[in-house]
Design a protein with these regions (language model features):
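Long, C-terminal catalytic modules of enzymes
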Residues: 135, 254, 260-262, 267-274, ...
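Short acidic, glycine-rich surface-loop motifs adjacent to enzyme active sites
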Residues: 31-38, 210-215
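Glycine-centered short loops/turns at secondary-structure junctions
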Residues: 61, 241-243, 381-386
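HKD-type phospholipase D/PLD-like phosphodiesterase module
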Residues: 1-28, 37-202, 242, 249-316, ...
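Gly/Ala-rich phosphate-binding loop of Rossmann-like dinucleotide-binding domains
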Residues: 58, 233, 237
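Long hydrophobic segments that form regular secondary structure
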Residues: 193-207, 214-216, 227-234
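Extended, hydrophobic alpha-helical segments in both membrane/secreted and soluble proteins
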Residues: 50, 225-230, 246
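Structural beta-sheet core signal
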Residues: 31, 66, 210, 248, ...
Length: 432
């Protein structure tokens, strides 16, 4: 579907890729960002900042179009300050805002004034190359196993691909700057992405490797990814597919969120996980049989959490989706809260290279050696490398399905579950 794909396997590779793309631009540059601290030095590039990188492009005569998330919740500068750091010439800035606002007690449950965000991260250069995900900028985002100033690590992935023969993709990036536009394949989001992820899971023959910043999916959500995972494992048990494996990597701590929000995210993860166990048993298989095929993991190194921000689904080492979407109704429900964008990748050689890189990194295996799904499964269960099995994580006894279901139903609100009505997106030009 796309040719000449490069999968970046950590934030350093992502930074190197978007620096190279921007520095190579000759005519035009389109940049969409959820979080861009224009003053933050780019890792591996001395004191170079995104502000200077864009200024250099502007000085070369490159026409720059920025689609900016004006919310400051996660580290963006105030819009007025950000505009001072964007180039003054050859640079047009549009901001994207959603109609969702928090009111009443819901506002008390969140440190943010809004629950809708422009969350698409991409770069297009000269209608020849594009990068999807991995191109946000913030000091918390650091290369693999580089501790940031807040004492946690960061896991990031990105995709660079050639779009010279992709006129629909080129047109999407141009039109999306003016108004939020449904993406053409191989770009995906919302219902298309949700359906594809389910298809990848249900049609996997060897393994599913899933990494998600947030994992909120159960019988009360309108995304059915967790159900698809259980259904596929149940089928493996019934058909005696002893080789089939599912790897689910997510976060038990979200140190870039407030303590209150972090607590509720953990409860929702536990609710989803425990619901999957109950659903599997309802389908007639034991938990012992269930866990012969699936493992739930988080990442930790020397006592510090590794923030999973990679949001990728890999099927059998042959196909994958890398997306800005989280596994929640906010991104993949029937009424999404956030704008998202992902890419379908079918370059098997590149996917397998990435898969082996990730498995070797998680096992702290140096020099790298070939790792099979069966071997990774066994070593993941025994907490090798930076892998931590969720089954061995110390969690309060109160995290039962019944308790969390009752509590979250009582507190049912948009920041945690998703939206109850369709979001209207507005794009406005910033006048400077």
């Amino acid at each position: 579907m796309v040719s000449r794909v490069t999968l970046c396997s950590d934030y350093q590779e992502c930074v190197n890729s978007f620096v190279q793309l921007i520095q190579s631009s000759k005519k035009e540059l389109w940049y969409s960002t959820f979080l861009c601290n224009l003053k933050s030095p780019l890792p591996g590039h001395g004191q170079l900042t995104m502000s200077q990188l864009l200024q250099d492009a502007s000085d070369r005569g490159v026409q720059i179009k920025v689609l900016y998330n004006p919310a400051t919740s996660y580290g963006n500068l105030e819009l007025k300050e950000a505009c001072e750091l964007f180039p003054k010439k050859n640079c047009a800035i549009n901001v994207c805002t959603g109609s969702g606002k928090l009111k009443g007690f819901r506002k008390l449950m969140s440190p943010h004034s809004t629950y809708t965000y422009h969350h698409q991260k991409y770069i297009m250069v000269d209608k020849e190359w594009a990068m999807v995900t991995g191109c946000d900028v913030d000091g918390d985002r650091q290369p693999w196993l580089t501790l940031n100033s807040k004492n946690y690590y960061w896991l990031e992935l990105g995709v660079v691909f050639n779009i010279r023969q992709q006129p629909l993709v080129q047109r999407f990036f141009e039109e999306n700057w003016k108004h939020i536009t449904p993406p053409p394949l191989p770009l995906i989001n919302a219902h298309t992405e949700h359906s594809l992820v389910q298809w990848l899971i249900m049609n996997a023959s060897s393994y599913i490797h899933l990494e998600q910043q947030l994992f909120i999916s159960n019988d009360k959500t309108t995304n059915y990814v967790a159900k698809a995972l259980v259904d596929r494992v149940v089928r493996a048990v019934r058909n005696q597919e002893q080789h089939f494996r599912c790897f689910v990597l997510t976060n038990v701590r979200n140190p870039d969120d407030s303590p209150l929000l972090d607590f509720f995210i953990l409860m929702l993860l536990m609710w989803s996980w425990r619901w999957m166990e109950l659903y599997a048993q309802e389908q007639g298989i034991t938990l012992g049989a269930f866990y012969e095929h699936i493992v739930f993991l988080h990442l930790e190194h020397e006592g510090y959490p590794i923030k999973v921000h990679s949001n990728i689904v890999i099927q059998d080492g042959l196909r994958c989706v890398r997306s800005s979407s989280n596994l929640t109704d906010r991104s993949l429900g029937t009424l999404p809260c956030d704008t998202e964008l992902g890419l379908v990748i079918t370059d098997a050689a590149e996917i397998q290279r990435l898969q082996q890189t990730l498995w070797n990194r998680y096992l702290l295996q140096d020099p790298p050696q070939p790792v099979t799904p069966a071997e990774f499964f066994v070593r993941a269960w025994s907490n090798q490398g930076v892998l931590r099995n969720l089954m061995t994580h110390s969690l309060p006894n109160m995290f039962s399905v019944e308790y969390i279901s009752f509590l979250m139903t009582m507190l049912h609100n948009e920041p945690f579950f998703g939206n109850r009505k369709k979001i209207r997106w507005t794009i406005k030009k910033v006048r400077r």
